[in-house]
Curated annotation (Swiss-Prot):
The gene is NCEH1. It comes from Homo sapiens (Human). Glycans are attached at N270, N287, N389. Residues 1-4 are cytoplasmic. Expressed in monocyte-derived macrophages. Up-regulated in invasive melanoma and breast carcinoma cell lines. This is Neutral cholesterol ester hydrolase 1.
Length: 408
């Protein structure tokens, strides 16, 4: 009996050691976040083992775990009709909210899920619940795009998928089929989905063939650049769940089908050192010392290397492509963008990407709403139902939907 108690105590201690990580006191539901992070880390470690054994690519294994535990079939309710279909060969899940008697045509949001261009799905519970809530509360049609993921495809194929599906949806006959007002359409996405939404928004402003334009764009903690991994938010949240800095850098390398040997050099900004001539032209477009308010820069110092590794940018020219890094787009492109909503979280390495983009858009004359949550963490908006229900998740979702309701 005594030995059993000792063993149980040891196991509990080991579990607590694995789960516990130091978190800022201001983050929402810290113990719940620790448990969520421990679960995700455990899944990552299992997928890495599978990769090491040669059984599958680690991202395929990890996404199999995520989708297996969270996939939801297209289930319609009394209020929202849900169907799986494809738009020009790209899978989508369509949520049709209830019509308003006084409005024969509905508004619409094209939504792009996050997951580092490699994980998640439009068909998992978290995104299904978000899009169902949007469709019902906005009396809208929500198109959630099931774009292809790394490692099956790499940049820029994810962009091609979302552009192809959205262009198909914008056809007059398709909008008519879903009873959508062509003047009330928004593009939106979270994290890597926010990146794709921003890239699509920029591309559509330059596409003269499009008869129907987007009214709004709404970007949720978007990832917008891979040239400076030492912004104040990257420094402040270097190990903050659920997106530590090294994980974000690896997502970028995976997206570009790059070499993992580059990761450590990129973490210290060796890929954009002063001797890398290719990066010089865009350096000012992400100069956080001028783009961020003093309340965010605090006492952090820029990390600018004098000499670095020019080979990285030469082998990964995608780093300097505005389709992957919308933050570095020309001002002439930015000034054509529609009214914009950007949601950022304090405890997120990507916080400053969103804030800098908001500043650049405002400087280009675009009307921007920057919605910042002091207790938010990366990914929080999709965590709204038990057992992963967070207070800040519910508040961010409500704030996002409220803005859409008032502006779309």
């Amino acid at each position: 009996m005594r030995s059993s108690c000792v063993l149980l105590t040891a196991l509990v201690a080991l579990a607590a050691y694995y789960v516990y990580i130091p978190l800022p006191g201001s983050v929402s539901d810290p113990w719940k976040l620790m448990l969520l992070d421990a679960t995700f880390r455990g899944a990552q470690q299992v997928s890495n083992l599978i990769h090491y054994l040669g059984l599958s690519h680690h991202l395929l294994a990890l996404n199999f775990i995520i989708v297996s535990f969270g996939k939801k079939s297209a289930w319609s309710s009394a209020q929202v009709k849900v169907t799986d279909t494809d738009f020009d060969g790209v899978e989508v899940r369509v949520f049709e909210g209830p019509p308003k008697p006084e409005e024969p045509l509905k508004r619409s949001v094209v939504y792009i899920h996050g997951g580092g261009w490699a994980l998640a799905s439009a068909k998992i519970r978290y995104y299904d619940e978000l899009c169902t809530a949007m469709a019902e509360e906005l009396n809208a049609v929500i198109v959630s795009i099931e774009y292809r993921l790394v490692p099956k495809v790499y940049f820029p194929e994810q962009i091609h998928d979302v552009v192809r599906a959205t262009k198909y949806f914008l056809k007059p006959e398709v909008l008519q089929k879903y009873m959508v007002d062509p003047g009330r359409i928004c593009i939106s996405g979270d994290s890597a989905g926010g990146n794709l939404a921003a890239a699509l928004g920029q591309q559509f402003t330059q596409d003269a063939s499009l008869k129907n334009k987007l009214k709004l764009q709404a970007l949720i903690y978007p990832v917008l650049q891979a040239l400076d991994f030492n912004t104040p938010s990257y420094q402040q949240n270097v190990n903050t769940p659920i997106l530590p800095r090294y994980v974000m850098v690896k997502y970028w390398v995976d997206y570009f089908k790059g070499n993992y040997d580059f990761v450590q050099a990129m973490i210290v900004n060796n890929h954009t050192s002063l001797d890398v001539e290719e990066a010089a032209a865009v350096r000012a477009r992400l100069n956080w010392t001028s783009l961020l308010p003093a309340s965010f820069t605090k006492n952090y110092k820029p990390v600018v290397q004098t000499t670095g590794n020019a080979r990285i940018v030469q082998e990964l020219p995608q780093l300097l492509d505005a389709r992957s890094a919308p933050l570095i787009a020309d001002q002439a492109v930015l000034q054509l963008l529609p009214k914009t909503y950007i949601l950022t979280c304090e405890h997120d390495v990507l916080r400053d990407d969103g804030i800098m983009y908001a500043k650049r858009l405002e400087s280009a004359g675009v009307e921007v709403t920057l919605d910042h949550f002091e207790d938010g963490f990366h990914g929080c908006m999709i965590f709204t139902s038990w057992p992963t229900n967070f207070s800040v998740g519910i508040r961010t979702r409500n704030s996002y939907i409220k803005w859409l309701d008032q502006n779309l």
